[in-house]
From Swiss-Prot:
MF terms (GO), sorted A to Z: DNA binding
Lineage of origin: Bacteria, Pseudomonadati, Pseudomonadota, Alphaproteobacteria, Maricaulales
Main subcellular location of this protein, as a coarse class: cytoplasm
Name of the protein this chain belongs to: Nucleoid-associated protein Mmar10_0436
Function, in words: Binds to DNA and alters its conformation. May be involved in regulation of gene expression, nucleoid organization and DNA protection.
Subunit field text: Homodimer.
UniProt keyword annotations, A-Z: Cytoplasm, DNA-binding
Protein's cellular compartments: Cytoplasm, Nucleoid
HAMAP family, sorted: DNA_YbaB_EbfC (MF_00274)
Recorded GO CC terms: bacterial nucleoid; cytosol
SUPFAM superfamilies for this protein: YbaB-like
Domain of life assignment: Bacteria
Length: 107
């Protein structure tokens, strides 16, 4: 019975940490860049887009493909950085959880 109570307390603490981690994910911003910083995309670690910056020198109506490619590259860079931030935040949140050997969190 004592083990069950300890497990319940551990589960409650984990739930609180996960709630806090979700808030941190929503607040953490990452910036992806392309074209030597001429295009920047800012996302939250949850993947929500915050802003896009495009240098005016890239706004050529005759060559929209260049801007399109740079936007995709900057977005991909921001997503990669967001995924890294997400892993770090979630790893911190799960830090106190004692899982059986070989078992991992589902993220």
């Amino acid at each position: 019975m004592k083990d069950l109570m300890g497990l319940m307390k551990q589960a409650q603490a984990m739930q609180q940490k996960m709630t806090e981690a979700q808030a941190r994910l929503a607040e953490t911003e990452v910036t992806g860049e392309a074209g030597a910083g001429l295009v920047r995309v800012v996302l939250t670690a949850k993947g929500d887009m915050v802003s896009i910056h495009v240098d005016k020198s890239l706004m050529d109506p005759d060559e929209p493909e260049i801007l399109e490619d740079l936007l995709k590259a900057a977005h991909a860079d921001a997503r990669r950085k967001g995924e890294e931030a997400q892993q770090d935040i979630m790893k911190d949140a799960a830090g106190g959880l004692q899982l059986p050997p070989g078992m991992q969190m589902p993220f």
